[in-house]
Structure formats: C-alpha cells, structure tokens
A protein has these predicted regions:
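Short acidic-glycine-tyrosine-enriched beta hairpin
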Residues: 68-82
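Histidine-centered metal-chelating micro-motifs
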Residues: 41-43, 78, 82-87
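A short, N-terminal "cap"/entry segment at the start of jelly-roll beta-barrel domains
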Residues: 1-30, 109-112
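Glycine- and acidic-residue-biased ligand/ion/polar-headgroup-sensing regions
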Residues: 49-51, 56-61
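A cytosolic small-molecule/anion-sensing beta-strand core signal
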Residues: 57-58, 73-74, 92
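Ligand-binding loop in jelly-roll beta-barrel domains
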Residues: 82-106
Length: 112
C-alpha cells in the first residue's frame, strides 16, 4: 500500500506562479494539488496525450477549455480531454486537484 501525506510532500512553484504538490506519480496516472492566489492563473496549455481532471477543493475561479469559460467552485469536477487548450484563474485563493492519465510530463505539455 502506498499512502502519501500532503504534509510530507515538498511544494514547488511553477513558472506561472502556481504552487504544486505532487501526491502520486506512476506511469499510468498522476495526482497533484495546485494552489493559486487571487487574480493568478495557470499558463494556457494543452497535453498531447494526457487526459486531465480538475476537482476544485476550495475557492472560486474561472476555467477555460478550448475557448469555453465557466465559473468553478468547490466540488466542481472538470474533464479536460487531450489536445484541449485550458487555463484556470483564481477569483479568491483557489485549491484544486489535478489528475492526469497517463501521468503528467513536461514533454507532453505545450504552452502558447
């Protein structure tokens, strides 16, 4: 059994300023917690192979997927298909889970 405590994972800051804690990473999937400060947004990007799910835990913001924009709040879950441009922006402090299958990789991620 492999159980990871959030507190045991060292957070890192991405180039767009979001804070990430990668909780699990196998070849077939990955799970990370991401946080954004009010007004902050992830860089608009897509994944060539990975399908991604965002689950909002705390806060509110807007999620854009392929030009469609929607407000998100706690326990909203969004499916982001491979090849879909996406970006999330925090209206207030925002904390969400990111699940990728196959697992997240920098090589699979393309930015504008």
């Amino acid at each position: 059994m492999h159980v990871t405590s959030r507190e045991a994972v060292e957070p890192f800051t991405t180039k767009d300023g979001s804070t990430i804690r990668e909780l699990h990473h196998t070849g077939s999937q990955s799970l990370a917690e991401a946080t954004l400060e009010p007004g902050q947004a992830t860089e608009r990007h897509y994944h060539r192979r990975s399908e991604e799910i965002y689950v909002v835990l705390e806060g509110k913001g807007t999620l854009e997927i392929d030009g469609e924009i929607r407000e998100v709040e706690p326990w909203d879950a969004a499916l982001i298909p491979p090849g879909s441009w996406h970006q999330i922006r925090a209206a207030v402090p925002l904390r969400f889970l990111c699940c990728c299958a196959p697992a997240y990789s920098h090589e699979d991620t393309l930015f504008e």
